[in-house]
Structure formats: structure tokens, C-alpha cells
């Protein structure tokens, strides 16, 4: 009952846009994927960007996963599971014979260790807050314990979770990368470099990594589902400008241009004879936003933050993207349960923005820094925002850096006054409104290495978020969604963000790549390396 409600209440909007697979898979083949930015880490407890997310998904396994191209939850490392009527106890039975790539069998203690590692403050991972409902969470994060009392392993094949409160998202949490299972001996042997020397039980194995050039992955011959993955190897080439990658794809040298099609080339490619076969274009649970660091002046003043919300011309930014986005007015994207269709947010109003700045004592404006990634079109969008801010007296220096450097700046207290999130965030980890709160707007994300780059912490909203996620009764689906919707519209009164756009996902693939479009814009993986194949 609990499981059925969870799936039905969170996936309907997403599943409606996903096509059904029609092609028969074939085995074999080596593919080349390109990105401009290098990969920062493949450690599942730390990696949290849209580029490494797909690779981590395929290197490791978790208790739960999703049917390819959908948001349908299914057991993975777990062979079966049960949930108590009160939603406080989850018991999982593990598949037998699943092995790490070092040859050792996966056992229950590995699950416990891996989640404790993801939560432990010493790891400095951004995903600890997802496990906040597990008993003992506060003791582990507070440093009074090294273990999690809410995870029990009575034998090698059984894992039991005891929660302090019901959590309507908990099965989804066990499917995200932070719940990936790793072997302790491999983590210890890597001596702090597990992100470059990953050992997992997923479909792929990292064979070689030349920093700044390429990563080479091979299929795991011992993966527990025979015949998966379908491809033999994946070579990820980094340092590739999107335009160069597109030209190489057209020549047959590249199979997937991971950064998509540069907006300036999109209509040309779309209208070309090969466009229909090359372009994968679909909606996604995405919001692109500007973070305003609430802990540094002048963004500690709500009037300044509200003024910035009114200063940005979002329609112009959608034109930069050739219409591949729509203006956003709240953190939640339109397809997410809880989205408030009646909410209008802050309109584009230069005069009101100037008046608010004057009220805050900044009639002559101020100087600040706007961080952005350096992959097209993000610098151009940042420059458009810079021009809009200049029109109200705010002089913003655009600092366009590699993605990893921007993420590091955002997760360092006081480092980044403003960040344009384009190319980094936020695409839902799973299709539930809570995922647009905890990591990026909740108090738990406002930590060193976290993704709450506005460093916004509203304890009253945190309490309401916990109350919303504790609504695990099937009869309270609508109530829970409404509660989340009100949380997000109330956040906008504090204006820690400027929600700018809801963008479509566009990927370019070669004609030899097979499978339905939804596995190239997978709602929980981005690119699903487990399911793609060569024709």
C-alpha cells in the first residue's frame, strides 16, 4: 500500500512525457561521449553534478533503482523488501551472488557502511541530509557516534532501516547515488582518492583515467543481470568545446555530445535532413536559477534580493536558448507535483527594482560577482543577467569558470555572492518536490561542500518540510503536495533565489545509437549507460 501510493503520487507527471521502447537491444560496440568539463570525482558519496551523475549510476549499485527511462522504482541490489504499516521500518533482502568488481560478494554490512560513510561529516559529501529520517542521524552528523543506529544487519543478506518518522521519499532516497554500495577495503586502500579509483558492483568498470583528457569504462562481465550493459565500452573525452563535439559527431567520430547542441546551431541542425535522428529533445524536472548568498552583504537584505528578482529579464534568456526554455517564477518546475500554477512570483520591473534598492540604502547600486560555468551558452546568459543588473545600478563582474570550480565556490561559505546555476542545477534526483528543497534550499544543504549556494536557512520551513515528508498516508497525497507547494511559494517571499528558466533537455547522438529517446534524457540518470546500445 505504502509503496503503491509513493509511485503513483510522484511519477504520473513524468511518465506522461516518456515514450515506450520499441527497438530490440543488440550487444557489443564501443562508444565515445564528450563533455567540455573534466570529471571532478566518481565517489558516490561526494559526486553531485549532472555529468558525473550518469557515470556513478552505472559504476555502482543501490538497493533500489528505476526502470530505464522512467521514474518507476524497482528493487536492484534488493531482491525484495517490506515496509511496516506505520512506515517506520523497511526490511530488504539482498540478491545473492552480486559481486564488487574486486571479486568480493556484496553483503548487508556493505550497505550499512556505505550509507554511514555518505552521512559522516568527515566525508564532506553533499547528500547526508537525504537520510535525516534514519534513527541515529543526529548522533552521526553531530560527531557523537561513528555508526547509524537505525541500520541493522542481522545477517549478510538482510538490511533493516528504522526511521524516527515516516518519510514518503525513502525508497527514492535508497535509489540515489548517495545510497550506492561500496566496499570498505577499497575505500581504505584508495587513501582518500576513491573518487579516482572507484570499485562498485554496477554495469561499468573504470579501466583508465587520464586527467583532463579521457575516462575509459568497460562493461562489467560479472554484473548480476546477464547481457547488461549492451555496450562493450564507453570512452568519455573531456575538454571538448560543444561546437567541436557537434562537428565531430557529424563526422562519425563521436556518438553522444553530452553538452548538447549549442543554441546558435540548434535550428540549423533541427531543420537538417539528419536532425530528427540526431536530436533528443524532451522536458525535464529542471529549474535554472541565480543564487543570492544570504550570508554576505548586501544580499543579507531581503529587499535587495527581491530587487534582483525584479531586475532580470527572463524572456530574453529564453530567446538566447532559441525557445528551449520557459520563464520560471518559483523553485519547482511545472511538471513537479506541488507546482502552484496560480503563483506569479516577481515580475520583470526595473522601476520597482530600483525603488527597492533605494529603500535598502543602495540607490546608487553596488558591486558584486556573478559566477557561471564557462560552457556555452552559460557565459552568454550570465552576461545577459549582468546587463539587466547594470540597468538597476548593480555592477556585477562575471566570473566564468570550469564547472567544478563554480561548485566548489558555491559550497564555500562567503565565497560566491551570486551564481548562475545553468549547466549545473537543478535537475531532480527523483520526481518529488522535497528534492527541490533539502539539498538546495534547506538548512542541511547550507554546509561546506553543500549545494545550498544561497546559504539560506529557515528553520520554520525546515520543520514544515519534515511535516510534509512525514505524510505517508495514501489519503494525504493531495495534502502533502499542497504543503510542499506552499513551502516553495513562501520561500519566494525571502527571495534567496531568482528562479530564471525551466529548460528542456537536449542531447545530440549519432545515427548508430539505438534505443528510445527517454534513455538519453533519463529522468533519474540523464544518460542511461545501462540501457543505450549500438544498432
Where are these regions (language model features)?
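Aromatic- and charge-enriched surface segment that lines or borders ligand/interaction sites
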Residues: 79-127, 160, 248, 298
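Surface-exposed binding/hinge segments that line
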Residues: 93, 112, 119, 123-183
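A structural "hinge/loop" feature
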Residues: 37-54, 77-78, 104, 126-127, ...
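Alpha-helical secondary-structure segments
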Residues: 32, 107-116, 156-162, 202-203, ...
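Ligand-site clamp/hinge motif
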Residues: 188, 192-195, 221-268, 395
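N-terminal lobe/hinge region of extracytoplasmic solute-binding protein
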Residues: 34-85, 116, 197-200
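Gly/Pro-rich hinge or "lid" segments in bacterial periplasmic/extracellular proteins
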Residues: 68, 145-149, 163-229, 233, ...
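Detector for C-terminal structural segments
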Residues: 31, 168, 210, 311-341, ...
